[in-house]
Amino acid sequence: VTSKDFSITTIDNIKVTPHIQEISWSLDMIEKGGYPHFMLKEIFEQPHTLRDAIRGRLNYVDGTARLSGLNLQYEQLQHINRIIFLACGTSWHAGLIGEYMIEENAGIPVEVEYASEFRYRSPIIQDGTIVFAISQSGETADTLAAMREAKRKGATVLGICNVVGSSIARDTDGGVYIHAGPEIGVASTKAFTSQIMVLSLISLLLARMRNMSLERGREVIQHLQEIPEKVEAALKKEDEVKKIAQMYYKKDNF
C-alpha cells in the first residue's frame, strides 16, 4: 500500500488483479434507525426483507418459482432424488422447515445435517443427490468444511446465503441469495424468515416439476405474496404484545 496506490500479491509474491465485488448495502442498513437495539430493528424489517426474498422470483403464469442462480438445467432439477441440507444453528432450523416443505410438496427425501458432524462421518453421495449449504454469513467454518467434503465426494453443492461474494457463494456450483441485508443482531430474525421464504421457493419449483398442478402452484404463489403483509399486520400489534409480556415475564413456568 502506498499513498497513491495498492497492489495485491500471492504468498509467492506474484502480483494478482483483484475481482472487485460491489455490495449494494447503504449506511442506513448498519444503523439502528431510531430503534433501541439492532434486534428490534431487524424484527421490524421482516416485511421488507421477505418481499425482497421473492422479488422477481415468482412466475404466476406457470405457477412456479424462477431461480436461475441454481445453475441447473431443467433435466437436472427433474432428476433430483435426494437433498441434503448442511447448516449450523438457526440455519439448521430453517433447513428442518425446508425438509417438511420439500418432502410434502415435491416428494423428494431430505436430510438435514449438522455441518459440524457431517464431515466426520462417511456420507454417501449418490447420483441425483443435491447438497445445499445454508448460512447467513456464507462464512460458517463448519458449513464450509462440510460443503467441501461433499464436493470432494462428487456432489453438486448449492448455497443459500445472504452475503454477496462470501466463501459459500464463491465455492458452490450455484445458489440463491436471501437478500435480507446486514444482520447485526446475534439472534437471527430476518435472515431466518428469509431463508424459509427461499426454501419455499425451492419447494415450489421442485414440486411443479413433479406432481403439483398449475392451479395449486398459483395458489401457493398467492399465499407467498400475502406473507409480508401478514407479518406487517402482526408487528402492528406491538403494544398488545408488550402488555402480555408485562403480565408474564416474571413467571417461572407455564
Residue ranges and their predicted role:
Residues 2-48, 55-60, 64-66, 174-178, ...:
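Terminal amphipathic helices with adjacent charged low-complexity linkers/tails
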Residues 35-39, 49-50, 89-98:
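Conserved phosphate/anionic-ligand binding catalytic regions in large, soluble enzymes, centered on
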Residues 37-39, 81-89, 249-254:
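Glycine-rich phosphate/diphosphate-binding loops and the adjacent beta-loop-alpha structural elements
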Residues 39, 69-74, 87, 120-122, ...:
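Generic recognition of flexible, low-complexity loop/linker segments
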Residues 53, 65-82, 124-126, 243-252:
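Glycine-rich phosphate/diphosphate-binding loops that line cofactor/substrate pockets in enzymes
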Residues 63-69, 111-117, 157-158, 236-239:
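Short gly/ser/thr-rich secondary-structure transition/capping motifs
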Residues 78-212, 218, 222-226:
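Glycine-rich phosphate-binding loops that contact phosphosugars or nucleotide phosphates
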Residues 226-243:
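Accessory alpha-helical/coil subdomains and C-terminal extensions
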